[in-house]
């Protein structure tokens, strides 16, 4: 996707907002977390699934309003390969919904994001 496409989406939706997807399992509504934890246990896989399900709900609600989403890689990396799989599936779903995707994969970020990178790589 090109930035020309993003500009077209902004014009069509009359909205330049980008929805940030900076997921933390504890921010996912309890009923979504419970369903994922019932299926996978309170594991990285369960947390990653909860985040994916929450993201899908957000994108379903926002896809007619916002032109783009921005998943923050640190929060997915923190959950190991299961989190990266959730990020991949989030990106694929966003594209299916016609959303422009801006992957936030920078390093040297603000404190909370730097902490998430640290947790993901150093434990």
Predicted regions and their residues:
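Active-site loop-to-helix "anion-binding N-cap" substructures in soluble metabolic enzymes
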Residues: 1-123
């Amino acid at each position: 996707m090109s930035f020309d496409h993003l500009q077209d989406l902004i014009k069509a939706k009359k909205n330049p907002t980008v929805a940030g997807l900076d997921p933390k399992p504890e921010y996912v509504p309890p009923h979504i977390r419970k369903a994922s934890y019932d299926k996978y246990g309170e594991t990285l896989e369960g947390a990653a699934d909860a985040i994916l399900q929450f993201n899908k709900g957000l994108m379903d609600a926002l896809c007619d309003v916002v032109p783009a989403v921005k998943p923050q890689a640190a929060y997915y990396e923190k959950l190991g390969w299961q989190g990266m799989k959730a990020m991949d599936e989030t990106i694929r779903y966003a594209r299916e919904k016609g959303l422009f995707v801006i992957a936030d994969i920078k390093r040297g970020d603000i404190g909370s994001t730097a902490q998430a990178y640290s947790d993901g790589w150093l434990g």
